[in-house]
Amino acid sequence: MLFSLRRLKKLANLEAFSDQKVIDSLINLGFEVDQITKLNEISGIKFGQILEIRKNPEADNLWICKVQFADKIREIQTAAKNVIENKQVLAFIPGSKSGNTTFLAKKLRGHISEGMLISAVELGFNKHLLNSELDQGVLVFDPIFDLESNPLKVLELDDLILDIKLLWNRPDGNSYLVLANELAAFFKTDFSLINKEISGKFYSELKIINKTDSKIFALEIQKLPKLALVDIFLLLKSEVKIGNLAQNFSNFILIYTGQPSYCLQLEKHQQKVELIEQKVKIKYEPDTISSYHFLNQEKKPLLIPEFSDQIIMENNSFFLIMPKFNLLKVKQIKQFLKKNSLKLTQLGKNYNYGTTFIALSFLNFFLEDQKIDFSWPINFDKSLISKKTFLDLNYNELKEILGLELSQEDISKTNLILEKIGYNFDNTSFSPPFYRVDIEFFADYAADFLRFYGLEKLKDCKLEQVKAKIPNPDFEPVKLKTLGYYETNSFLLISKEENFNPLELKSQDLLTFPSQEHTKIRYSLAWQLAKITKYNQKRKITEISLYEKGSIAGWNHSLALASTIYTSEDLKKHLKILYNYDFDFLPADSEFLNPEKSQFIYLDNVLVGWLGQVAEKYNYENVNFLEILLSKVEKIPKKEGGKIKFRPYDNSQLKYRDITLSLPMKDIPDPYLKVIQKIPEIFSVKLINYVIINNQQKITYRITGPDQVCAEIDKFYK
């Protein structure tokens, strides 16, 4: 968001501090000042009042204006047709500068022009953001300014525009009041615009019937305020397009408080408004979208936010609607409209009721200053922000997190500063500011503590000398490529309906997401591998082996294999090649898996993965999968191997024994094979036959080894 440095300094009472010091403090407070732009390069301009206008007889489109300035009367020629007698203007007079240009008195078409009248564009504002009133010629306004005063100061035109990038979890920061409050706390100056009380002059009779899952608050205001010229300029500095009085007022509340709002006007006999969701269509677009509609008592639309505004009569009472719409719905509307306005952007952020309270508190101050009556808030109760979340205080943990030796005086002084931005402390706990949504853990408080304690107080630490160690190379990609697998990459997010969860992991619900197809953090890599496999099968590729390593729900890191070539037994061997652990395989009981062809993988009695085929309902019966949770496997220490012993070379021929296991259909051979594999010096165990007879599995394995292996097997079976 773009901020005016002049306005921030004015709100926070920082006029005594240099621009650079205030900018540095914003950076120290954790706000990324991405760009600093000077509004203009002008100096020496003056206020003037037009006394008389006459046409230049020697020119078709020039007017001679007699203008009263503080020091004298000057005649200035202009082609602007919107000049009016007794109105005030801004002017470059002889000696004024704009960039490298110095203005002088100059003869034009037979008459001396002692300067130039100024338009909004010449002050540095974007022409495309101006309304017709500001763009019809030079700036003309009512005679309210002292001609002795400096326009650059009074209208805040000697300004720097700061492009401040805010973290996604600080939607409250899109507000002049919140930033000014933090600056005032940092510099220990007074700031009183965020009060703890809200009031009203009367109680509104409006009833809002809300048939949506959104929250709607409102304020009845007796007259539409007209923004001062300096506040119109503030909107332009924020790259907000100037509109009618209602739009300007709503946008001013937005940049000042962070609360989006809309203006709504009812006929006097109407006491009820209904909020519903229904389809809306815009011109030249074939599609429709469900959006919010404010209806009157006759069920006719009064306002469709972001689609159609209501025309507000200036001198009649109206309602300022302050919504907290469903974030998903806002995102859909934003994509449908292909619109990226400041209001829509803020509507899509997770601001809380504290932001609405700040808006109501500021409106109390602003409307009283304008001598405009307003109601008590509609639907808003202070209890919405009085329910505080308390977190335990642990100053030893604070010192450990920050790596600082903090005295009790350091802690007390910093906590006093934090109280100015809304923290509350007692002996053992604290509650965060009522408008913040980012303070959930003690570490969040520690980060705020450091911001106001001072980043510059972090001491340089001498790095401990460590011995260089060459990391072990990662051979997994090479091994997988050698085994014939191709790497894939897929999205971390997946649709709710497709979220395949055989290991019963838990995931966070997302407040915002890119689309309906990407609403949940995936529980498994296998589902996307299955879809990639099916896509390639449709392309007549039948022999497919794929793998992916990536993140899944619960901060887990996973490896998944999918193959139409390899059997489940092959995948077990590949797992052993990749990770030399002694895994156990047990029958899998999961709605997501085929119970007859799937197994869970355990390591030291910890569930670390699954193997086999997905449930038949998914129609992927010819694809075998293996998925292993690497983050769990890595936590289990490897068992150290025994001491290596060398024996004399034995050149005798290897022999084999064929063993057939007869098992029930849901049983698996792994526990029986583990018993056999305990026989020392086995060379290999291979599956050579698998049949089903009378609902029994007949599984034949060939065990190869030297004479003593065959002797042990013969002994075992006897």
Curated annotation (Swiss-Prot):
Cofactor(s) the record lists: Mg(2+)
Subcellular location: Cytoplasm
Co-factor note (free text): Binds 2 magnesium ions per tetramer.
InterPro entries in the record: aa-tRNA-synth_II/BPL/LPL, DNA-bd_dom_put_sf, NA-bd_OB-fold, Phe-tRNA-ligase_IIc_bsu_bact, PheRS_beta_core, tRNA-bd_dom, tRNA_bind_bactPheRS, tRNA_synthase_B5-dom
Residues of the B5 domain: 386-460
Gene3D superfamilies from the UniProt entry: 3.30.56.10, Bira Bifunctional Protein, Domain 2, Nucleic acid-binding proteins
Binding site for Mg(2+): D438, D444, D448
GO cellular component terms, A-Z: cytoplasm
Molecular function in Gene Ontology: ATP binding; magnesium ion binding; phenylalanine-tRNA ligase activity; tRNA binding
Listed EC numbers: 6.1.1.20
BP-aspect Gene Ontology terms: phenylalanyl-tRNA aminoacylation
Top-level lineage group: Bacteria
Catalytic activity annotation: tRNA(Phe) + L-phenylalanine + ATP = L-phenylalanyl-tRNA(Phe) + AMP + diphosphate + H(+)
Enzyme class: ligase
Assigned keywords, A-Z: Aminoacyl-tRNA synthetase, ATP-binding, Cytoplasm, Ligase, Magnesium, Metal-binding, Nucleotide-binding, Protein biosynthesis, RNA-binding, tRNA-binding
Domain tRNA-binding: 39-153
Annotated family: Belongs to the phenylalanyl-tRNA synthetase beta subunit family. Type 1 subfamily.
NCBIfam families recorded: PRK00629.5-1, PRK00629.5-4
Quaternary structure (record): Tetramer of two alpha and two beta subunits.
Protein name: Phenylalanine--tRNA ligase beta subunit
